[in-house]
Structure formats: C-alpha cells, structure tokens
C-alpha cells in the first residue's frame, strides 16, 4: 500500500510514517487546500509527500521550502483560478524546475475535479495511480 505524507507547509521534517521515511520520498506535490491533498492522496499508488499551502505561502517560507526540498522532484497542482496561478508564479520563481500539473479549467478546483480526471492528470505527470480511480465517478 502506498503512503502519502499529508503535511501543512510549515511541517516538513524528517520522520517515519507507515514504514516509509519521508526523507527518502523523492516526489513532492504542492497543493492549496486540505481537501485537495486528501483527494490527491486517495488517487496515488506510490509514496509522495503532499504539502498544503492553505492557499498562500510567504516568500520567506518558500525560500525555506527550497532548502528543505532540495534534490526532490517537486510538482505544483493548484486550482484553475487566480489564487492558483499566483501560487504557480511563486513556485516558478523559486523552483524553476518544478513540474506543473493542471486540471481542466471546467472543474476550477482540484477538490471539485472528478477522481478519474485527477488520476488521469497525475498519470500524465508520471505518478503511479490506483487503477480503480479511473473507474470511480465516471458519471460525475
């Protein structure tokens, strides 16, 4: 079973959860809200650190994250709105190599996107996703 570390942005430290050491997890996904990270965690089938910014992040905290996440594959999965675009711009400045994962604008929010759509965009970004995610919610 995969382990997703669900962390608010101010708690990135070394510890062990479910047999996986967070320091050994290579992939990190930055999301805006708690409901976003819970939905993403439900789709993933591999260990991933999921960091929630609670919609905003200060430049000082962003610089700290840059040090803490050095050497990891960082991805930003933000809502398709102005706040999401602002977050992406901040991360592009400090993490120019970060990958950006986009949901269809029709859903506007990560939390509002159907599970199958979220699985599809994560799979396109080379994440291992639960196959059953493609079958759930197709009628949404």
Each language-model region and where it sits:
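Short, Lys/Arg-enriched N-terminal segments with co-localized hydrophobic residues
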Residues: 2-21
């Amino acid at each position: 079973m995969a382990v997703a570390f669900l962390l608010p942005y101010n708690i990135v430290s070394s510890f062990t959860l479910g047999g996986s050491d967070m320091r050994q997890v290579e992939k990190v996904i930055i999301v805006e809200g708690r409901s976003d990270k819970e939905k993403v965690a439900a789709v993933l089938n591999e260990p991933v650190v999921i960091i929630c910014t609670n919609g905003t992040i200060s430049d000082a905290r962003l610089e700290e994250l840059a040090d803490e996440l050095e050497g990891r594959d960082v991805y930003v999965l933000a809502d398709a709105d102005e706040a999401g675009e602002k977050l992406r711009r901040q991360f592009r400045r400090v993490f120019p190599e970060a990958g950006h994962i986009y949901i269809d604008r029709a859903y506007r929010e990560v939390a509002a996107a159907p599970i199958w759509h979220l699985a599809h965009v994560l799979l396109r970004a080379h994440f291992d996703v639960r196959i059953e995610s493609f079958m759930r919610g197709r009628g949404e």
